[in-house]
């Protein structure tokens, strides 16, 4: 599933091709995604794309009359292609641009979304989200306050989008390992010093993943159709039973909140 770095890489890739371009046509080949694509999205036709932003794992394509909201779901990707290239099997949505290019949305599992929001109003999918992890709003003081008294396992806690957005399973595993925190430890029992380190590691891991083009485990490709390379930098995710990169102790694996968690029982307390 594309997580925050992969979505940010997609944003960076499509922005130079889209900003300032007019959407001459929107082609919806299959409206049945995670939620039905609303008829209102047709309003994007004839509009200039003013900017492309990201909120959590949603991409926002802004125009003067509203904004398209794109979520990549489990297997979605966005490509910039010449409009003359015919669509393939799982190409569900095209935005045809005045430049002669097309923004093409491919989603084999159809668990992504295309929605429509009105100017200056948060769509309901955006209204309850926590701060961005790479922003100045996500601080040790903020996380310490949110964690106070919480018995929830820190891994589940940090993956809650109401606490902070975009720290998905891959990056939660990696950040907890880097900070030396056991994933089942109660969020409210972690010291201020460890919380501060954890916040720093989350920011560092996510920033490095973006620099590496995201993580491609199966489906993700960027706007040029290329995979991300952060998978080569993973320290623990997907490596249960292999030696810890710090102490050589075999890495443990368990399910926490129905998600695979890999950690070192020696290095993470």
From Swiss-Prot:
Intrachain S-S bonds: none
Keywords: DNA damage, DNA repair, DNA-binding, Glycosidase, Hydrolase, Lyase, Metal-binding, Multifunctional enzyme, Zinc, Zinc-finger
Positions annotated to bind DNA: 90, 109, 150
Keyword Transferase: no
Domain of life: Bacteria
Catalysed reactions, semicolon-separated: Hydrolysis of DNA containing ring-opened 7-methylguanine residues, releasing 2,6-diamino-4-hydroxy-5-(N-methyl)formamidopyrimidine; 2'-deoxyribonucleotide-(2'-deoxyribose 5'-phosphate)-2'-deoxyribonucleotide-DNA = a 3'-end 2'-deoxyribonucleotide-(2,3-dehydro-2,3-deoxyribose 5'-phosphate)-DNA + a 5'-end 5'-phospho-2'-deoxyribonucleoside-DNA + H(+)
Keyword check for Transferase: no
Active site positions: 2 (schiff-base intermediate with dna), 3 (proton donor), 57 (proton donor), 259 (proton donor)
Enzyme Commission number(s) from the entry: 3.2.2.23, 4.2.99.18
Signal sequence, renumbered to the chain: none
SUPFAM superfamilies: Glucocorticoid receptor-like (DNA-binding domain), N-terminal domain of MutM-like DNA repair proteins, S13-like H2TH domain
NCBIfam families, A to Z: fpg (TIGR00577), PRK01103.1 (NF002211)
PANTHER family, sorted: FORMAMIDOPYRIMIDINE-DNA GLYCOSYLASE
Family note: Belongs to the FPG family.
UniProt protein name: Formamidopyrimidine-DNA glycosylase
Lineage summary: Bacteria, Pseudomonadati, Pseudomonadota, Gammaproteobacteria, Vibrionales
Gene this chain is encoded by: mutM
């Amino acid at each position: 599933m594309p997580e925050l770095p992969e979505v940010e890489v997609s944003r960076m890739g499509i922005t130079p091709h889209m900003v300032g371009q007019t959407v001459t046509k929107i082609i919806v080949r299959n409206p049945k995604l995670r939620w039905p694509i609303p008829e209102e999205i047709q309003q994007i036709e004839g509009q200039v794309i003013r900017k492309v932003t990201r909120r959590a794992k949603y991409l926002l394509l802004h125009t003067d009359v509203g904004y398209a909201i794109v979520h990549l779901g489990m297997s979605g990707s966005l490509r910039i292609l010449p409009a003359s290239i015919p669509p393939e099997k799982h190409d569900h949505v095209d935005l045809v641009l005045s430049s002669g290019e097309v923004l093409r949305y491919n989603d084999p599992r159809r668990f992504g979304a295309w929605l429509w929001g009105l100017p200056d109003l948060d769509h309901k999918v955006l209204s309850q989200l926590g701060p961005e992890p790479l922003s100045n709003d996500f601080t040790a003081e903020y996380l310490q306050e949110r964690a106070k008294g919480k018995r929830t396992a820190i891994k589940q806690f940090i993956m809650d989008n109401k606490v902070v957005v975009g720290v998905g399973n891959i990056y939660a595993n990696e950040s907890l390992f880097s900070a030396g925190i056991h994933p089942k430890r109660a969020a409210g029992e972690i010291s201020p010093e460890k919380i501060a380190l954890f916040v720093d590691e989350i920011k560092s891991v996510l920033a490095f993943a973006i620099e590496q083009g995201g993580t491609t485990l199966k489906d993700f490709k960027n706007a040029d159709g290329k995979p991300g390379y952060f998978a080569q930098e993973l320290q623990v995710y997907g490596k249960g039973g292999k030696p810890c990169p710090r102490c050589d102790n075999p890495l443990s694996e368990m399910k926490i909140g129905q998600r695979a968690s890999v950690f070192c029982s020696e290095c993470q307390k």
